[in-house]
Design a protein with these regions (language model features):
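Conserved N-terminal segment of class I S-adenosyl-L-methionine
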Residues: 1-124, 130, 147
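Short glycine-/acidic-enriched loop or helix-start segments at secondary-structure transitions
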Residues: 75, 97, 142-143, 171-173
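Glycine-rich, phosphate-binding/catalytic loops in enzymes
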Residues: 80, 148-150, 177-181
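A short beta-strand submotif of the Rossmann-like class I SAM-dependent methyltransferase core
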Residues: 133-136
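Histidine-centered divalent metal-coordination motifs
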Residues: 139
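A short glycine-rich, Lys/Arg-flanked "PGG" loop and its adjoining helix->strand segment in the class I
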Residues: 144-156
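Conserved class I S-adenosyl-L-methionine
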Residues: 161-185
């Protein structure tokens, strides 16, 4: 009874625009959707007194995007002037889509995809000027270890940017992928 009722109520709420729904409908790929939304991923930081512009964040810098998905956001950072961009995720299926987009955008020469766990990487100490984790921390099992590892591989004077949707947000827990009812979690 509970599931059927939820299913009926859910029909009253339109699903939010979501990349997986768009990809399933053949509208766009996850990577391209991420790329188009790239500016949205950094707007939180541009309002701070520490960052004056996207060029300030990325220009001439080595950037690691932890929890990059299909790397559309990563490519956006590359287009903002990053010297080298590295995307890291644990989902192997994203790698091909990421390299395809890098080629399409002319970023292949400065892009690397790393399949791995952000809590224990193979990067040398102080490898990156910028580490960004956009909508990633809510997916990691050991956030303290991920942050400690990020600190290890971040260059002295580098910047770590982290944001994630709070669980208690109306569409928290990423249930908006399949359920349009706010606060259902």
């Amino acid at each position: 009874m509970g599931y059927k009722l939820l299913e009926q109520i859910n029909r009253l709420f339109p699903l939010p625009v979501h990349p997986f729904n768009l990809q399933n409908d053949g509208v766009t790929t996850y990577a391209k959707w991420q790329y188009e939304k790239g500016a949205d991923t950094i707007k939180f930081y541009l309002d701070s007194p520490v960052v004056s512009s996207s060029a300030d964040m990325f220009s001439g810098k080595s950037v690691l995007d932890i929890g990059c998905g299909a790397c559309g956001k990563t490519m956006f950072y590359g287009k903002m002037g990053a010297e080298h961009i590295t995307g890291m995720d644990i989902v192997p299926e994203y790698e091909k889509e990421a390299y395809d987009l890098a080629k399409e955008l002319g970023l292949s020469d400065k892009f690397t995809f790393v399949l791995g766990d952000a809590a224990k990487t193979d990067f040398r100490d102080e490898s990156f000027d910028v580490i960004i984790m956009n909508d990633a921390m809510e997916h990691v099992a050991e956030p303290e270890k991920v942050l400690a590892e990020a600190y290890r591989i971040l260059k002295k004077g580098g910047r770590l940017y982290v944001n994630f949707p709070p669980y208690n947000h109306p569409f928290g827990a990423h249930l908006s992928d399949v359920i349009g009812i706010p606060w259902v979690h």
